[in-house]
Amino acid sequence: MKKQSGFTLIELVMVIVILGILAATALPKFADLSSDAEKASLQGARGSVSSASSIAHAAYLVDSTTVSIEGTAVAFANKYPTAATIAAVAGLAATDFTTSVTGTVATITKTGGTADCAFTYTEAAANAAPTISVVADGGTSAAVCP
């Protein structure tokens, strides 16, 4: 009898089936990378808005007449940037982020992203800091957005 040296057809088919199952399990994770990138981008923008608000507030406390940050004149409400100027103060490019202002609330979304994933900047009330809140899944689920 000949000594077997190699794999049988059944062994090769089983390996292919197992690799197919592993690929089908892993594919959804890799297919969702664009959503992860959108979330990370919004987290960065949210941090930028928070920092810019604090920096502008500190500048206002030092010199309460006119404050200009990176060439942008800052309008204030209760010693913090207004909703209309916060995106410019934070340096959020209009090509990357869309800002819509309704009254004292600015809603910031990623340009080309989903409307379900956004955050809001609400102007400061008297003797309080502004509020930066996550809006996710139409405001019903924080699982969609960080």
Annotated model-derived regions:
Residues M1-S34:
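N-terminal single-pass transmembrane signal-anchor helix
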Residues L19-G20, S50, K110-G112:
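Alpha-helical interaction segments
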Residues A58-P146:
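Periplasmic/extracellular, small/polar-rich flexible segments of pilin-like filament-forming proteins
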